[in-house]
Every structure is written in C-alpha cells, then in structure tokens.
Amino acid sequence: MNQKGRGLEILINEKQDGQWLFSVLKTALKASKPVIQDWMSHQQIKVNHESVLNNMIVKKGDRVFIDLQESEASSVIPEYGELDILFEDNHMLIINKPAGIATHPNEDGQTGTLANLIAYHYQINGETCKVRHVHRLDQDTSGAIVFAKHRLAHAILDQQLEKKTLKRTYTAIAEGKLRTKKGTINSPIGRDRSHPTRRRVSPGGQTAVTHFKVMASNAKERLSLVELELETGRTHQIRVHLASLGHPLTGDSLYGGGSKLLNRQALHANKVQAVHPITDELIVAEAPFPADMKNLCRTYFS
C-alpha cells in the first residue's frame, strides 16, 4: 500500500488475486463495510483509473486507488484563532488545547470552540474535511487532543480508543497527600441526580478505570503532583475519581477543590500515544504545560 497525495493505492498481489474488493479493503485498510460503501457512493474508489460503484473481483496487477479527501458540508463555523499543533499530516491532527475553550459546539451556529478554530485551519489550507474529534477534553482542561481528517482515520482511531491502545496521560495537582504512591481506581461513574453537570462514583454507573502515580508532594501546602493514565474515558473521570478518594483537584470547585491557587481545575493532558491509522507508525505527542500549571509546579514542586 502506498500513499499518493491524500489518497492510498493498493497494487493487488498474488494472494489477493480473485478476492472481492470489499475483502481486500477491509483487510488492507481495516475499513468497515459502511465506510467502503460510502467511498463507492461518492466515487472515491478507482480500479485501474475507473470509478467503482459496486463490489467486484480484483486480479493480480490491478491498481486500486482510494481518494481519502472528503468534500463534506459541516455545521461548524470557521473562526480564526491560534492553534498549537503538536502533529499534523493528511490523516490526523493533534492539538495542544488551551484551558477555557470547549472542544466542540453543542449547538448549530455556536462559535468560540476549538472545532471552530480547526475548521478555519482546514479552510485556509484547502482541506474540505469535517472536524472529527476522537476524544474530548473538558472546557477547563488543557492539553493534547486528537482529531481525524477523514472517515477511515476516525474509525481506526476510535477503535484504538475502544481497545485501549490509544494512550492518554494526564498531570494533575490534587489536594492533600494520597495514601499510596501509585495505584488504580476502578470505580464506576454515573450522573449526579442532584446536579445538572456533576458526575459521581455510582455502583450503577459505567465502568471507569484510572491508573495514577504520585510524582511529588508538598506537605506544607498539602498538594500532590499526580500523573494519571486513562483506561476508560468517562466524563470528568479523573476529577471524579480523585475527589472520591478525598483529593479533589485544586481549582476544581465543582468537585470540592479550593480556588485560591488556580481558577480552573489543575488538569493537563500532557501526552497522547496512538498508532497512525494509515502508516502504523507509533505517534507520540507531548503537550507542554500552560503557564498557570507551569507556575504552580515551579512554585510548589521544584
């Protein structure tokens, strides 16, 4: 399989000779049947330079080209803004999101979100793809977040997220001293019926697993610098799990954290690790701390 611009070309080999095109694409690209059918309906697949609209038998020596560039209408309004790009190619984008900005709009016409800035970035670079986030970050959480540029990349990265091979590492400043230096919090999370946005540990909630390691502590100020890795991705997962241990994040007023040091939860997604959806290369993107977290670390954990 070779990359050609924003597409892929497969030269049918002896092993693939006589196979159905769907089978070849599913095996070679990990593409689902709906994705392949969508490519065909939009004339994005060509065999020997001829558009293919239906499944067919391929022969050794056939050249199958898949155009991954998609021309799709999007409800996200492009809006200019600076982006801190950690990684980008024709298939995926990783951004260091600042705190205070939502990942995506919650309603048509909304602006001021990260997705709006990415839509503008795509527009000025001649890319006609939708803004597809692979995972989310809370509005007041900073750090690395992954976007896919086409359906295939999104499907593969989403599968990695489901299989827990897309790794997300966070750094948090929690209140108090944790009892153990490292461990795993395995507590289901559900909605808090007494509050419209808050979550809580609940026996009837969804499975939620967080691994943690204390990197440093400050006994005088009763603060802990904690590195965390998500095995699942529930809303507010780290915030809920640490609060359930009696160690809310500093600045996280929703879950009982004090706000004298920071006016937002002290949580930063410092690293994401994923297998590239097309090349199978291991992509590791590290997001530098924003100024507020950097200053706290320098002051209390230097």
Curated annotation (Swiss-Prot):
GO molecular function, one term: rRNA pseudouridine synthase activity
SUPFAM superfamilies with a match to the protein in the record: Pseudouridine synthase
Annotated coiled-coil segments of the chain: none
Protein origin, superkingdom: Bacteria
Keywords in alphabetical order: Isomerase, RNA-binding
Gene3D superfamilies assigned: Pseudouridine synthase
Region (Disordered): 182-205
Its EC number(s): 5.4.99.-
Disulfide-bonded cysteines: none
One of the GO BP terms on file: enzyme-directed rRNA pseudouridine synthesis
Domain S4 RNA-binding: 19-90
Catalytically driven reaction(s): a uridine in RNA = a pseudouridine in RNA
Membrane-crossing residue ranges in chain numbering: none
Annotated active site: D138
Pfam families documented for this protein: PseudoU_synth_2, S4
Signal peptide (from-to): none
Sequence similarity: Belongs to the pseudouridine synthase RluA family.
NCBIfam families: rluA_subfam (TIGR00005)
Name of protein: Uncharacterized RNA pseudouridine synthase YhcT
Species annotation: Bacillus subtilis (strain 168)
